[in-house]
Amino acid sequence: MRAAMNFRINNSLLIEAERDAVLELRHAMHREPELSNNEWKTQQRIRGMLERFGLKGATVFHNTGLYIDIEGSASGPKRAVAVRGDIDALPIQETRDDLPYQSHVEGVMHACGHDLHASIAMGVALAFHRMRNNFAGKLRVFFQPAEEAEPLGGRTVLEERLLEGFDNAVGFHVTPSIQVGKFGAREGAVSKSSDQFKVTVSGSAAHGSTPHNGIDAITIAAAFVNEVQKVISREVPVDDRSVITIGTIHGGEATNIICPKVVMEGTIRTTNPELRPLLSQRVREIAEGVAALHRGKAEVVVTSGEPAVINDPEMVRLFRDAVSDMAGSDALTQGKAISGSDDFGFYSQCIPSIYFWFGSGEPGNESGVHTPTFAVSDDVLIPTTELAVKYCFDLLHGQSAR
């Protein structure tokens, strides 16, 4: 028996047609995954399903995304809550041929569970549309494109002020590190910010036998790689978990030529918003300083990515209550903060937010996200959707997280 069958959540918040739609969308998205900023078929599929259930007037954002507003007509506090389900896939070849809904797109798969996230968001939208006479306030459901790659859909939500007037935002992510049937949420930072940098080191060429006649860009680059890590080990508090990674390094054309140019690219990650600009500044200072020390030059370009996702403590408390009510206290786990990033950080930068995890780990489904063997049982989908419905209802209907 699968662990998911032990859920106390009992399909009471979704009607049969809604449950079927959630599964239908998950399977269709998994069969036809689309990469970031190219989710055109996915967008039309989502719009079609919304309209099939009477939800018309979805608004396009970020070209390939949609959001839908559902207004409640009951008396009560007129709160506004946003829900995010991301929809993009990854450039990975799926190798799980045991799935009846295996990806039909060569080299592309839903290796991060966004097919589940979007389907849960769909279930929330359909349930609240049906129950619109039973709640007060407004629910906005985002089917957000481009979580995985720039330009990021979450940044568009921030820049176009799509959360203006909203009280709370709800996001979620599947994880095989948590057992099926369990849900996790923790207060504070649950992911790192992610900024990208490019360092171009310039020297001058010379014959390999006469290095004194040139300026060796490889030597400068090597010094930078060593020195920049001292920022983490000597300038950042040990419990901050900041990371500076050099991901690519390119330079040199021949074994007997002093290299005149090296290009390096990497990422800067931290959970501390105050450290974020300082780390970028130090990368720049070290690159320029090391280059000057060796009589070369360095040009540094830093591109801001997503901020850290920050969970609001009161929203976490209310979420734990919802899990206990629906699945029992033994279904609760704190979960571990991730070292990666998620553009839901743009949402939590705007308004009090929560980003909770739902477990998918079970025999046969242990592979991590972003791997070709990642898979999640359908069994987790409906219980998680119903929990999301219950939680959003609590936020909207008199269970203020503020």
Swiss-Prot record:
CDD domains: M20_Acy1 (cd03886). SUPFAM superfamilies: Bacterial exopeptidase dimerisation domain, Zn-dependent exopeptidases. It is an enzyme of class 3 (hydrolase). Its EC number is 3.-.-.-. Pfam families: M20_dimer, Peptidase_M20. NCBIfam families: amidohydrolases. This is Uncharacterized hydrolase y4tI.
